[in-house]
Every structure is written in C-alpha cells, then in structure tokens.
Amino acid sequence: MRFPGKRKSKHYFPVADRGLVSFAEDAEAKDVYIVGIGQLLVDIEAHVDASWLERLGVAAGQSEVLDDDWVDKVYAELKAEDLVVGEYAGGSVGNTLHNFSVLADNRSFLLGAITRHITVNDYAFHYIRHTSARVGLNHLAPRDGPMGRAVCLVTADGERSFGISRGVMDDLPASAIPEELVAGGAALVLTAYLLRDETAPIFAATVRAMEIANAAGVPVVLSLGTASLVHHRRDSLRALIADKVDVLAGNLDEVAALTGETDPLLAASAALELVDLVLLTRDRHGLYLGGWVDESEARETRDPIHSKAIPEYNLYEYSRAMPRSACTQPQKVFSHINPYHGGAKVVANTNGAGDGALAALLHDMAANVHHRQSAPTSPKHRSRFLTYSSVHQICKYANRVSFEVLRRHAPRLVQGLPEREDSLEEDYWDA
C-alpha cells in the first residue's frame, strides 16, 4: 500500500525515519483491500441550460430514475444538438473504489451487475477500460440487458443533475455476494442509491453484504446519494444506518435531510448519534469530519481553536477516530477545513468531489488496518481506532483529493497525488 508522503502540512502518514517500530518483529501482514457494491453506470455528461432539466424531468442537483426509452430520446436530442461533452465510467461507488485504488496503489473489489454481452466500444467496454486495473471486476454478475446510464446535465453554475436509465444496474442477486471476500475486507462501501427500491435484487444483496460485514467486524461505509432520496426514505434509512452502518458520508443537504439539522456542525453531531464517523462536504465551504474518541485518547489541537454552532469544536481535532463501542468515556471530535488553495480556479462541475474525499478517508482507514496487521504491538494500536491519522489530518487529505478531482474536471483520478507539491518551496523537501 502506498502511504502518501510529505504534503502541505508535512505528513498525512509517517513514511520514514520514525524509528518506533520494526515491522519485521511482528506478524506478516495479510492482503488489505476494500469491497464496494455499486450500480454500474456510464455517465453521459452534457452542458445545458436550465430548461433541459424541466424537459428531462429532473430537479436541479438531484437524481431521478427515468424510463429507459425516454432517456434514449433525450440522449439522441443532446447528441443532435452537440451538447454531449463526454461519456465516462461512473457510479458513486465505482468512482470511490477507482480513486481509492489510484491513491493507495492497492486493490479493491467492485460488486454489481453488468451486461452479459460486451463488444468493443460499447458502454460496458468503456466502463471497464476507464476503471483502474487495481479494481477487481471478477466478481461482477453478468446479466441480460443494457448497461445502466446516467445522463449528467451540467448547468452554467456547475451544478449537476442526473437522469438515470436503469438497464441491468439493479439486477445483482444476493446469491452473488462473495461472503469470504466481504468478511476479509478493510471496509464495505455502499451508497443509499442501492436502497432506493426494496423490490430490486440489489437491495437484498446490499442488506446481505451489510450483515456479513457486521458479523465480521468490517466497517460499513455509506454515502447518502441525494437529498431527495434521503427525504423520501428518511425513516427507513435512519433505522438501517443506526443498525448496520459505521461511517456516513454526504453533503450538507443530504446529512441535513437525514438529521433535520441545517448547520453543518450540528448535522454532523446529530449523525454521530447514528454512526461512528461522519464525513460532511459543503461545496465552496470545504468539508467537516466528526467522530468519537475515548477521553483517554483525546488529543488537543496545536492549531487555533474555533467556535461556531459548537463552541471550541476543534479542540480535540488531533485525535484519531474510534468506534463509539470501544470508548469507555466517549466524546465527539470535529475538524473543518476550507477548500485547498481556495478551491479550483474553474469548476466545470462538482461531479465526483465527494467520492474523492471519501476515497481519501477509506485510504486512511485501510492504512490503519495495514499497519495494525503489520505491527500489532505498535503503540498506535493500544486502543481500537478506526483511522490511522487524526481527524484533522484526514480533513486535509480528503480536501486535497477533492481539489484534484475538481481541477481535472473528471470524477476519476488518472494518477495519485504528486510526490511534491508545486506550491511548496524547494527547501521544504530538504528539511
């Protein structure tokens, strides 16, 4: 596993010359990977004016499932007017796993349904071609029918709205979930989109995977999808999250829809009553990370202390997140960071920024598992932690990855972060 080296604030991970622990003295590390269940989609990106949202029947910033024939008709019109700017491998979980594998140079596995018949230059061919070779696709379930598609309408303000053509994306049966693979992962990554339709095969498959992960002690990570989806299924989602989910990720609108709190800190705090760790993104206002830590493991920040809706909310942001169940005296910890370098100069669209941030968090969680297996006697593992780094450092890392996604105007990274940041003076690297 690649451990990112020096960055804007020295280390995301310690990489050399710490001299604390000899890996050779401990047990040999097992393979570390993450598993995700995704709706395999091809994103069809089109730059349009707001009138197209009404024509497609999609609310601004939301995602709606539409009739396949209607999507075919709209797609033909977009092509005829030369509004389609690209067609890419997509899907929230697919993007997250791809970016995780690129960042960590490590394996991940994608579970889902894909069309049985794949030919050169069709949608399924391009999906596979644009997915990192480190993402294992050998557990995909082949099904008769077309590939799922997401028409991504990007308006002048950079907002993206999706019209979804299902194809076979929901046809993953519970019997296709590989129990041993899920139970051996460092995390199980899911999205609330999988839970939209309780009659769909993928719903039962997702619940089955959750049960396997819960029984094996594998953290279940859920991204919330869209605010409209959360509003529609709020009560059932809250019950499922409280029962089976460990880590929650979403933007402010989505977390607010789940918790009823519109302030980001209060929304994150309310979400922590359901889960152990919360990643909350807020567009141009950066991102927040909230978690639990035992009072004995709380570490005070050495940065300025800030107060917002929660007084001195970042006082213990140098703490590493722990499962609440592992805390004798649990307390909440929060950190916030503004966009890296003020954000990308030009934001063509925000597609994938949240998936990138979540990939960074997953990298840190997997690194914790990797280190614990490699050096179980290290003092870093005297308590049961969810993360390798502090919530403060993870905020910085997630923020940097989001910036890279926005800067490249694509939801999937083509390479990891640079070994040296161009913004830093040369003597920094010699320090």
Predicted regions and their residues:
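Active-site alpha-helical elements of protease catalytic centers
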Residues: 87-111, 355-359
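Ribokinase/PfkB-type carbohydrate-kinase core domain
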Residues: 1-63, 84-88, 105, 113-344, ...
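Active-site gating loops and adjacent loop-to-helix segments of metal-dependent hydrolytic enzymes
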Residues: 56-80
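Short, threonine-centered small-residue motifs that mark membrane-proximal processing/anchoring sites
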Residues: 348-351
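The catalytic Tyr-X3-Lys active-site helix of short-chain dehydrogenase/reductase
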Residues: 353, 357, 394, 398
